[in-house]
Curated annotation (Swiss-Prot):
<dbReference type="GO" id="GO:0019740">
    <property type="term" value="P:nitrogen utilization"/>
</dbReference>
<dbReference type="GO" id="GO:0035527">
    <property type="term" value="F:3-hydroxypropionate dehydrogenase (NADP+) activity"/>
</dbReference>
<keyword id="KW-0288">FMN</keyword>
<dbReference type="Pfam" id="PF00881">
    <property type="entry name" value="Nitroreductase"/>
</dbReference>
<keyword id="KW-0520">NAD</keyword>
<dbReference type="InterPro" id="IPR000415">
    <property type="entry name" value="Nitroreductase-like"/>
</dbReference>
<protein>
    <recommendedName>
        <fullName>Probable malonic semialdehyde reductase RutE</fullName>
        <ecNumber>1.1.1.298</ecNumber>
    </recommendedName>
</protein>
<dbReference type="GO" id="GO:0006212">
    <property type="term" value="P:uracil catabolic process"/>
</dbReference>
<keyword id="KW-0521">NADP</keyword>
<dbReference type="InterPro" id="IPR029479">
    <property type="entry name" value="Nitroreductase"/>
</dbReference>
<comment type="function">
    <text>May reduce toxic product malonic semialdehyde to 3-hydroxypropionic acid, which is excreted.</text>
</comment>
<keyword id="KW-0285">Flavoprotein</keyword>
<dbReference type="InterPro" id="IPR050461">
    <property type="entry name" value="Nitroreductase_HadB/RutE"/>
</dbReference>
<comment type="similarity">
    <text>Belongs to the nitroreductase family. HadB/RutE subfamily.</text>
</comment>
<dbReference type="InterPro" id="IPR023936">
    <property type="entry name" value="RutE-like"/>
</dbReference>
<keyword id="KW-0560">Oxidoreductase</keyword>
Length: 196
């Protein structure tokens, strides 16, 4: 049986964590990005399908390729973030299932149903994006996830000729708390949950 993490860890991962819009000029190392992936890859996905693929944009040249896809409200915070992760999903993720899920012929579940494959890839890559956010927080980083961008432009600029499609963007770095907005409310248990 697992032990509960400390109250301090819960604060870091959830209750005190914020979505950041401003960033300190502290770089995020390639080693840290590798450490992030080494943590988040263990989060569960359906049949261990692991459809998410990540592009970590760290250079000015990479940010300029991304710029035309960004909405005006997401432009400045993305250009100044040390890292922007493109979270994509592989439309042919099932080709890795003989390696990732060798217990049966899971590949055929998806090759026989393109709709199931797309739904599975999108849903599970979204879950993996959440694991990446939690891994960032666990390593002392801050994040700013965004869906306000032109997906087709990102796909054309970064994934042309591939089986990858963009899902969302996540800015990653060390946040500038002076640029945080007031904390917004969340739905109560009664508003969001049911008990049967």
């Amino acid at each position: 049986m697992n032990e509960a993490v400390s109250p301090g860890a819960l604060s870091t991962l959830f209750t005190d964590a914020r979505t950041h819009n401003g960033w300190r000029e502290t770089p995020v190392s390639d080693e840290t990005l590798r450490e992030l992936y080494a943590l988040m890859k263990w989060g569960p996905t359906s049949a261990n399908c692991s459809p998410a693929r990540f592009v970590f944009i760290r250079t000015a040249e990479g940010k300029e390729r991304l710029r035309p896809a960004l909405s005006s409200g997401n432009l400045q915070k993305t250009l100044t973030a040390p890292v922007t992760a493109i979270v994509a999903w592989d439309s042919e993720f099932y080709e890795r299932l003989p390696q990732l899920f060798p217990h049966g012929d899971a590949r055929s579940w998806f090759t026989s149903s393109p709709q199931l494959a797309e739904e599975t890839a999108f849903r599970n890559s979204s879950m993996q994006a959440a694991y990446l956010i939690v891994a960032c927080r666990a390593l002392g980083l801050d994040t700013g996830p965004m869906s306000g961008f032109d997906r087709q432009h990102v796909d054309d600029a970064f994934f042309a000729g591939s089986t990858l499609k963009s899902n969302l963007l996540i800015n990653i770095g060390y946040g500038d708390s002076s640029k945080l907005y007031a904390r917004l409310p969340r739905l109560s248990f009664e508003e969001a949950c049911g008990l049967l």
